[in-house]
C-alpha cells in the first residue's frame, strides 16, 4: 500500500465501527495533517452517520493543539476537546507535576465522549491554569460534522482507547519539545523559564517515557513535527562577525556614541550540549544548548541562527539557571560536546555592541557587532572597514569546522574540549544517580574556572 493511501478497516475490538490500517512511515506535520483529514473523511463515510472519535496525543509542546485546530478548520462544526480541561484540582498534585495521568478526570471524559457518540448533549469542563482549578462547564450538542477530536498528552491512554476510532501521535524530538514546552508554560501559567525547565527535567520527561511514549506507538498515524519554535520570536539580534584585522579601539570609539559609551571585559566559559541521537560532527545550530558561566552565574541559551546577507540573525531565549540543571539535561539524554573559553572586550553605547572576542580553542580574535537594528549594525561594520569580510558562523560552528577538518585531513584530530566527561559510561552512571551527577558536574566545572 502506498504511504499516502488510506485503507479503512473494521476495528479489531468493535466490528461495527471502523478505523484505518496503520501507516508504516512517520510523517511530517503537513503530510500528517493531510492524511489525518483524509482518514477522518474515509472513516466518517464508512460509518454512515455515526460520530467518529479521533485521539491526538504527544508530549507537551509537540503540536497537538496546532494539528487538531487545523483539522477543525477544514472539517467545520467538529468538536475539539482538550484534556487540559480535565485536570481534577481536588486530587493531590505532587511537586507541581500537572502531567501526572492520575490527575485526569477520565470518568468525566468518558461520560462526555459517550454522550456525544450517543447523540446526546453533554457538559464539558473548563479549567483555568492561572488559578489551578475548574471554573465552569460548557454545554455542547453532538457535532454536526460527526467528528469529535480529543487532544492531550493522554489522549491515547488505555482508559479511553476503546472509544477511539482513529489514533494520531505527534512528537518533535526531545529538543524542540523541550523548547516549545518552556514557551507554552511561560505564556499560559506565568512560570519563569528556568522554573519550567526545572519541572521538565525533573518530572515531565520521566512521565513521558513511562506513561506516554508507549501509547504513541499504537497510533495509526504517527507525525514528527519539525516546526522551528524560534520562528515566531520577536526582537532578534543582528550580528556581524569578522576576524580582527586592524580594527583599533579608536576606530570603535569613533563609531559609537561617545556620550554613552561603556567598556568592560568579560570572561566566559561556554558549555555546549546536543540532544539524544545527535553527533557533534553532524549537528546544527538549532540542536545546541549553550550553558554559559560568567563570574560564577550560569545561564542557558537555546538558539536558532538564520543567515541572511552578511548577517547572522539570532532569535534566542536565554535565562539564568543553577549548575544542577546540567545534570537534568543529561538525564534527558543530552551530551556535552564542547567547552569553549572566551575573553571579550566589550564596547557599547545603548544601541549597538562591538566586542573583541578572543577564543582560546580557536586560537583567534574576532570582531563582533550586535544590535536589534540591522541598519545600525551594518553601518557600524562599514565604518570599521569590515564589509566583504564577514563570517556567517557562530563560534561553535567554527570550532565544529576545525574538528571536522582534522578528521578529514587524517592529521592530529582536534579533540573536543570536554575533559572526557561525556563518555557513555559516565552518562549511564550519572543517569542512575542525579545527585552524584550534579555534584560531579559542579566540581568539574568549578575546577575549570
Swiss-Prot record:
Binding site for ATP: 58-65
Entry's Gene Ontology BP terms: CTP salvage; UMP salvage
Domain CYTH: 235-401
PROSITE patterns: CYTH (PS51707)
Protein name: Uridine-cytidine kinase C
Family recorded in the similarity comment: Belongs to the uridine kinase family.
InterPro entries on file: CYTH-like_dom_sf, CYTH_domain, P-loop_NTPase, PRK/URK
Reaction(s) catalysed (UniProt annotation): uridine + ATP = UMP + ADP + H(+); cytidine + ATP = CMP + ADP + H(+)
Function noted in UniProt: Catalyzes the conversion of uridine into uridine monophosphate and cytidine into cytidine monophosphate in the pyrimidine salvage pathway.
Nucleotide-binding recorded as keyword: yes
Gene: udkC
Ranges in a coiled coil: none
GO MF annotations in UniProt: ATP binding; cytidine kinase activity; pyrophosphatase activity; uridine kinase activity
Pathway(s) it belongs to: Pyrimidine metabolism; CTP biosynthesis via salvage pathway; CTP from cytidine: step 1/3; Pyrimidine metabolism; UMP biosynthesis via salvage pathway; UMP from uridine: step 1/1
Alphabetically ordered keywords of this record: ATP-binding, Kinase, Nucleotide-binding, Transferase
Highest taxon in the source lineage: Eukaryota
GO CC annotation terms, alphabetical: cytoplasm
Amino acid at each position: 500500500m502506498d504511504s499516502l493511501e488510506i485503507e479503512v478497516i473494521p476495528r479489531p475490538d468493535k466490528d461495527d465501527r471502523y478505523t484505518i490500517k496503520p501507516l508504516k512511515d512517520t510523517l511530517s506535520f503537513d503530510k500528517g495533517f493531510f492524511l489525518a483529514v483524509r482518514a477522518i473523511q474515509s472513516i466518517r463515510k464508512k460509518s454512515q452517520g455515526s460520530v467518529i472519535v479521533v485521539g491526538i496525543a504527544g508530549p507537551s509542546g509537540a503540536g497537538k493543539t496546532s494539528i487538531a485546530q487545523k483539522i477543525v478548520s477544514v472539517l467545520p462544526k467538529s468538536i475539539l476537546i482538550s484534556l487540559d480541561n480535565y485536570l481534577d484540582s481536588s486530587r493531590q498534585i505532587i511537586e507541581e507535576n500537572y502531567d501526572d495521568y492520575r490527575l485526569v478526570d477520565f470518568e468525566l471524559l468518558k461520560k462526555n465522549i459517550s454522550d456525544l457518540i450517543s447523540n446526546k448533549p453533554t457538559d464539558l469542563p473548563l479549567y483555568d491554569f492561572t488559578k489551578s482549578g475548574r471554573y465552569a462547564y460548557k454545554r455542547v450538542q453532538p457535532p454536526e460534522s460527526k467528528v469529535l477530536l480529543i487532544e492531550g498528552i493522554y489522549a491515547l491512554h488505555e482508559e479511553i482507547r476503546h472509544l477511539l476510532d482513529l489514533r494520531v501521535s505527534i512528537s518533535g524530538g526531545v529538543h524542540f519539545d523541550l523548547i516549545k514546552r518552556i514557551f507554552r508554560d511561560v505564556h499560559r501559567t506565568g512560570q519563569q523559564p528556568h522554573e519550567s525547565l526545572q519541572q521538565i527535567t525533573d518530572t515531565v520527561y520521566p512521565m513521558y517515557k513511562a506513561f506516554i511514549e508507549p501509547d504513541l506507538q499504537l497510533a495509526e498515524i504517527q507525525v514528527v513535527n519539525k516546526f522551528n519554535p524560534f520562528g515566531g520570536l520577536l526582537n532578534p539580534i543582528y550580528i556581524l562577525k569578522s576576524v580582527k584585522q586592524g580594527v583599533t579601539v579608536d576606530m570603535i570609539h569613533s563609531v559609537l556614541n561617545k556620550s554613552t559609551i561603556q567598556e568592560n571585559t568579560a570572561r566566559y566559559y561556554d558549555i555546549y550540549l546536543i540532544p539524544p541521537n545527535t553527533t557533534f560532527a553532524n549537528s546544527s545550530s538549532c540542536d545546541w544548548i549553550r550553558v554559559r558561566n560568567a563570574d560564577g552565574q550560569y545561564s542557558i541559551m537555546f538558539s536558532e541562527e538564520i543567515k541572511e546577507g552578511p548577517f547572522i540573525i539570532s532569535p534566542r531565549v536565554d535565562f539564568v539557571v543553577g549548575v544542577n540543571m546540567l545534570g537534568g539535561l543529561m538525564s534527558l539524554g543530552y551530551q556535552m560536546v564542547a567547552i569553549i573559553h572566551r575573553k571579550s572586550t566589550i564596547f557599547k553605547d545603548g544601541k549597538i555592541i562591538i566586542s573583541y572576542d578572543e577564543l582560546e580553542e580557536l586560537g583567534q580574535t574576532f570582531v563582533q557587532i550586535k544590535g536589534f537594528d540591522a541598519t545600525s549594525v551594518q553601518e557600524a561594520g562599514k565604518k570599521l572597514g569590515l564589509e566583504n569580510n564577514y563570517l556567517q558562523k557562530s563560534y561553535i560552528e567554527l570550532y565544529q569546522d576545525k574538528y571536522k577538518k582534522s578528521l578529514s585531513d587524517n592529521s592530529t584530530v582536534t579533540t573536543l574540549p570536554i575533559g572526557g566527561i561525556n563518555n557513555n559510561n559516565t552518562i549511564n552512571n550519572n543517569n542512575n544517580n542525579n545527585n552524584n551527577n550534579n555534584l560531579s558536574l559542579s566540581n568539574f566545572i568549578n575546577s575549570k574556572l
